[in-house]
Amino acid sequence: MHGTVSRSSSSSNMTDVSSPAGGAASPVEIATSSSTAATTSASASSSKPLTNGANKTAISTAAGVTPGAAPGPGCAAIPASGSSGNQVKLEHHYRQSNNNRPAGSNRSSETKLRSPAGESDGASRLMTPAGSSSSPSQSPSQSQSQSQASIQTQTSQQDRLVKAPSTTASQQDVDEVARLFEEKPEAFEKWLTERAPPEALSRLQEFIENRKPHKRPSVTSDLFQQWMAASPTVQQKSPRSLSNSSASSLPECRRHLMDLDEGELFMELIRDVANELDIDVLCHKILVNVGLLTHADRGSLFLAKGTPTNKYLVAKLFDVTQKTALKDAVTRASAEEIIIPFGIGIAGMVAQTKQMINIKEAYKDARFNCEIDLKTGYKTNAILCMPICNYEGDIIGVAQIINKTNGCMEFDEHDVEIFRRYLTFCGIGIQNAQLFEMSVQEYRRNQILLNLARSIFEEQNNLECLVTKIMTEARELLKCERCSVFLVDLDCCEASHLEKIIEKPNQPATRAIKSADSFEEKKMRNRFTVLFELGGEYQAANVSRPSVSELSSSTLAQIAQFVATTGQTVNICDVIEWVRDHNQIRAEDEIDSTQAILCMPIMNAQKKVIGVAQLINKANGVPFTESDASIFEAFAIFCGLGIHNTQMYENACKLMAKQKVALECLSYHATASQDQTEKLTQDAIAEAESYNLYSFTFTDFELVDDDTCRAVLRMFMQCNLVSQFQIPYDVLCRWVLSVRKNYRPVKYHNWRHALNVAQTMFAMLKTGKMERFMTDLEILGLLVACLCHDLDHRGTNNAFQTKTESPLAILYTTSTMEHHHFDQCVMILNSEGNNIFQALSPEDYRSVMKTVESAILSTDLAMYFKKRNAFLELVENGEFDWQGEEKKDLLCGMMMTACDVSAIAKPWEVQHKVAKLVADEFFDQGDLEKLQLNTQPVAMMDRERKDELPKMQVGFIDVICLPLYRVLCDTFPWITPLYEGTLENRRNWQDLAEKVEMGLTWIDHDTIDKPVEEFAACADEEIKDIEFTVTTLNCNQQSQHGSEDSHTPEHQRSGSRLSMKKTGALGKAVRSKLSKTLYNSMDGSKPKTSLKLLESHVSEDMDDKSPTSPSQPQASGSMGRMSASSSTSSAGGQMVDKSKKRSKLCALL
């Protein structure tokens, strides 16, 4: 059964909409009763009735109901949220709607949700109970009784929801309604779409809108959004002006204004223009309202334009009557643009003097121009012209009204005063409208510039599309007829000096440019090669490559050439006169059609002119303004960015192609030859013991180059990596040979160093039993990383790369060389026939490459210092499980550092030779820093401070090596030999450092060729002519005669750390250390030769001295300079007790 709607003119009416049987039930019942019935039902309703005069409305809202829920067996006015606050909001909106109704409206409604009997599912329908309509003769008490009886006939479910005197629904009622809404939401939706009355829908819409967050009130927000959302044609008209644009509707909508007095009319007309922000609509309203206030027949409004030095008036609207439609007025003003300079005519004089002009008889005034009357046939009698100023008193326009319509022949003082007062408010409105128009234009400009910025990235591979898009946007925004872009030949700009000489063989070979030819020379360098031209709105862009003759004959091209040469922006109002004033422009074509030109250079990031942008002729025939120039400058900047970005992109593509070619060539030459690979494949590989691979004392000094490769293969075999990961044997051999080939022949960081690092890792894994903590894949990655960790090393460190700003330092900002080593490793693996990981699964490949990368980067000592504290913390906490990803990475990093510096733990005869290689490489880098950077290198790289190397070796061991090996051997005791070897070498370096500090032991060679032990440790061997110098020990004492011994050489006595060969004095600290060294040397049977020599010289000197000798005073402690040889040593062996001589020596020291 379809719902029926019954309406009556009585004071009480009800609306009944019933649901069909078995169909969707109606969740809302709206009962419209009389005002007295609504008042009585308030006690039984869930909300208080709202009153508005004679109308009273009761709204019952079931809390907890949402608009999308299914209806339940209850009573609700409108589905709402569970809080009473929403009900209050709804009542507030309803009160507002009642207040907005006209007086005398007698519509009151009571909204309830009820279920008819017999519907167990809780569905409800909109119905009108019998007897609810009351006649006008019924008393309020009778109507109240009938209303109460109607409520009492509801079902028990309805009574649970509507209870008096409760103002809110119970939670049980809410649950029942919510349950029904959740079970049957489609029933509620169907009722809303098919059977809900318009009044219920409107109230529901108000309730939904009320729940939305309110926007901040703004006078211009809605208009601005509507303006920007409209099309460009609609933007030219105000949205609110369209309804008032017809000539017939304007008098109708203003007819009620005639009933207002003058004050009310004035205020009403002010309100009419107060919030109007469309400049066209505002000017139209001003003229119509002024005509209404002053009884003027028609009026015109002029707006001030131009620069401060060249101002003029432009007719915004002209000859507007009260019946003139806005569209007609705007069209006529646009078609016949009237421009009046300041000081010309009536309006021009008012604008210049800011004084009002009231003319009673226009034809008798010399300033009046009667040409308009002759064209239109209209006769002008009286004119009232008045300036429009802003709040600062500046002229922003002029308003002019003509002829009275009330029978008067002139404008009296009353008209003048009303006109002046109204224009005061109009000045504020006009300036606001202009500011709003400027904001809209600025918004559009910003949107265009954002689109241009987006286009730069989208069209970076297509220069023609990018320039065409920029030109199109510039033409549309600046309203010009044509637009052109000239691009400079950049290859010509970057031509070498030799090419210029070849082009001009008759010119002298000099870089100097004659002043007379400077402009022509610049023109040659800024030669245009590409021209983009864009004509009218429906014309496509034209791209051409003009010839030299075409550029020379074109005036526009010559002007563009002038801009490119000078780098200046030109804004030309009269092209013919400008060309006449510039003699450099020698064009042949006609320029009659060209009126105005705006030409601007396009520059790249280096401020080089790469093109010229040119605008030709404004659409309205006026010159380009400063505002146009500023906007066009933004287009030129974006055009320059786009062109520069496109060229950079092209260059990057070329460089990438070159890089690919270079990598192919490098890969070919970096790969081992097939002959070498076949030879190594067929060679027999000795056992690991024959190479001493399991020992931490391994040395490669006795191995030839081929043996080093065989030793590497043996390590892979012993770790079972070849069969485990199915590495083809020929691929492994080729990879080993390729790795060896890619190491440079530097003194230390070469292939031999990589072999030693890999062997130490192998010994740690096998002998040190570290393999139990590693997987086979990690062992493979660690060995590969050890062999590749210094690939392509240049003999310089990261600091040198940064100082010299090398390409590697630019490519890698941190761990420069280590990243390069890893990249070289990847390059070799990617070379044909060198991928030893080819049989791995993708997951295993990623895992092993991650291990290799992390291990190689860990060889940077900066990374070691970052990881060391975390590793020490784990060890101190007793960590024994190293299988976590982070912990395994820390352990591998420490192992890589331990292997990288393992030369410090080799036997002393190996260690000091390796130290010589390291020192040589460091000294070479120091020499490069002095030569290339003109800086003083650090001590360990300064060849002049090579005597400090033993001391620096001790510091290196103390800071890096010993702490690392100590913590490793404490955790993994099987690698203790590394710690013990380092400790032994530290003692040797410390002993050498002390002797060097005393000056007793240093061989004057460029490198550490022979340690002092080689000539001082063998007491049994015969000493052959070793020159030894003993200087004065008590050097500060003078003889009694005030002069030094004649045998004492002259020397500088201030230094205490100079060698004895160079000086004749020892400081107190040096004598103390020397005494300590001598005592330490007395270990029993075989004192060192140096000690024997010193004792021999001292005993001979003491035996030769006599206490009474006149030539040697007793007070003098001087000792002569003597040369020690083998014969002297043997001949000087007098029968002197050895302990006695030692005691005398110690006494002297």
Curated annotation (Swiss-Prot):
Propeptide feature ranges: 1147-1149
InterPro entries the record matches: GAF, GAF-like_dom_sf, HD/PDEase_dom, PDEase, PDEase_catalytic_dom, PDEase_catalytic_dom_sf, PDEase_CS
Residue positions where Cysteine methyl ester is found in the record: C1146
Domain of life: Eukaryota
Record field: compositional bias (Polar residues): 48-59, 96-108
Cofactor: how bound: Binds 2 divalent metal cations per subunit. Site 1 may preferentially bind zinc ions, while site 2 has a preference for magnesium and/or manganese ions.
Lipidation (S-farnesyl cysteine): C1146
UniProt-recorded Gene Ontology molecular function terms: 3',5'-cyclic-GMP phosphodiesterase activity; metal ion binding
Boundaries of every GAF domain copy: 278-430, 462-643
Cofactor(s) of this protein: a divalent metal cation
Chief place of localization: membrane
Membrane topology: Lipid-anchor
Keyword Transferase: no
Active site residues according to the UniProt entry: H749
Any Pfam family the entry gives: GAF
Subunit comment: Interacts with PrBP.
Family, similarity comment: Belongs to the cyclic nucleotide phosphodiesterase family.
Name of the protein described by the UniProt record: cGMP-specific 3',5'-cyclic phosphodiesterase
Organism encoding this protein: Drosophila yakuba (Fruit fly)
Phylogenetic lineage: Eukaryota, Metazoa, Ecdysozoa, Arthropoda, Hexapoda
Gene from which the chain derives: Pde6
